[in-house]
Regions:
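Exposed alpha-helical structural elements
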Residues: 6, 17-18, 40, 52, ...
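Short acidic DE-rich linear segments
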Residues: 2-5, 86-92
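Short, charge-rich amphipathic alpha-helices with coiled-coil/heptad character
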Residues: 1-24
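Amphipathic alpha-helical coiled-coil segments and their boundaries
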Residues: 13, 20, 27, 34, ...
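Amphipathic alpha-helical coiled-coil segments
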Residues: 20, 24-34, 38-41, 74-84, ...
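Short E/K-rich amphipathic alpha-helical oligomerization segments
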Residues: 42-64
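Residue-level signal for short amphipathic helical patches enriched in basic/charged
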Residues: 29, 48, 91
Length: 92
């Protein structure tokens, strides 16, 4: 972590604080991107969650062909969002 040491010296901030704030910023950016992608998928299908997406499949209101990629992507993104939130809580 030479970069952290150099930058903390230049900015005259505590190395640990710079590291912590850098991680928070990274996680917030990752969370924003994740939420943006979730928004795009949920808007596309007029749903609010992967559970709602699954209900559309069960009711036959949506075809699996051409949509399953979005379903699995949304499922992954929702799980990732929760992990990021948990990581951010640990840094508070």
């Amino acid at each position: 972590m030479e970069a952290i040491a150099k930058i903390s010296s230049i900015l005259k901030v505590d190395q640990k604080e710079l590291e912590k704030e850098s991680i928070k910023t990274y996680l917030r950016l990752k969370l924003r991107r994740c939420e943006s992608e979730i928004f795009n998928i949920t808007k596309k299908y007029k749903i609010s969650s992967v559970e709602e997406f699954e209900d559309l499949y069960k009711k036959g209101e949506i075809e699996e062909e051409g949509t399953w990629e979005d379903f699995f992507r949304l499922d992954h993104l929702e799980a990732e969002k929760e992990l990021i939130k948990r990581a951010l809580e640990e840094l508070q």
